[in-house]
Structure formats: structure tokens, C-alpha cells
Amino acid sequence: QQLSAKLSLDGAEALSVDGVYRGGDTENPLGLTVSIPGLPLAPANAFLPPDAVRLSGALQGKLTLAGTSAKPKIDGALHFAGTQVQVPMIGTTFGLGTEKIVIDSSRVRFTGYRIIAPNKKPLTIDGEVDFADITTDLRIAATDFQFINVAKNRGSMVYGQGYMDMEATVKGEIDDLMIRGSVDLLRGTEVNYVMQDAPPELKNRAQNMVTFVSFSDTVSQRQDR
């Protein structure tokens, strides 16, 4: 059976599917090609919770699907174009790199893929996610990455500047991930959290509730004792 479908948004083709479905072939009924000249991401915001991420930009690429619907074999490559991810919880917007994300036999491979901070420093991702058995093997690294960049305003729960160095690995099945690594907060980090609905007794004890201390600061350590 021959298949053909197209999706257009605002008069422009965003996605098309062409190929065949072989109903009598139980081993390999799918033979489809998915072309994505430019799938806008902003419409997806309508289906996301208000406090989740907000997307802009587009997804582009080309995929082939073979095998069965229960166990498809996906190959191809995708990349983001002009894409930004706004995180309302921390009021900060990150850019997504334009590097190709290769999909090989249903394995999504990241090679130096970048998430770009407001200060233009990248967090890089290497490794793969295997959708056949939903397992991950990722390495994440960042240097001087600005993870918060928010001016103080009446609506902000979090404001300030935050910078970090990070090295981490993410491995295992998606429902049993093992995450290991280190995160170093850098000089210049000053982040404030506003407790908007805290009970009065908690507000009265809020000062110095959390204190970050440098272990190389021997004066502070002696005072703590």
C-alpha cells in the first residue's frame, strides 16, 4: 500500500511522509521516508504545562523508517534551526546548537552537541540514546556555563547570576538512570530564591538558611566550629 502525507503550517510545508506499508510482510512492513524541511516548534507550547519549557525555532532533517510499528528501525539525521528553550522556573533562555543529531538503527548519537548559555558558553553532550531498549550512555561537560541570568523583578521566584563548571555521565535504562559527576559553582554566582508562599515561622528563620562555604576558606570553617 502506497502512503503519502504532508503537513503544512502557515502555507509552508513543514513535514512530509512517503513510502509503502506492506501489510502481508510481518518482518518488515514499513518502508517510509519522513522529510522535515522546517517543523516549527512554537505550536508545541500549547500542549506543554505553563511552567514547563517554552520552545521557539524549528526542527529540520530526514528520516527513514523500516521494520515494524512495534519495533521500528529509524535512520537519518535531525538538527535544530534558530531554536531557543525558555525555562520559566529560572527565567533563563538557552539556545540549541545546529549540530546534526544522527540516528543510526534507532540509536540517537550526540557528537559535541551544544546547549548554549546566555553568556554564549556551551554545555556539550556526547554519547547515545538507544530507543530500541530505551537506554542512555551520555557524557556532559561545561565550563563557565551561565545557568541563571535573571534581573530582579516582582514576578521572579529566582533571580541573579549563576555560573558553573560541570562534568557528568548519564547511563542506564531510562527508569533507572545512574548519574555521576561534579558541579562547581564559580566566582560571580549570586542567586536569590523568593519564598512567596512560605508560612510566617519559616520566613522568620529564612536568613542564612542555606550558606555556601568554600572549603579553602579556613577562617569561615573555624567560625562554624
Across the structure, where does each feature detected by a protein language model lie?
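Interface amphipathic segments
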Residues: 1-62, 70-75, 79-167, 173-225
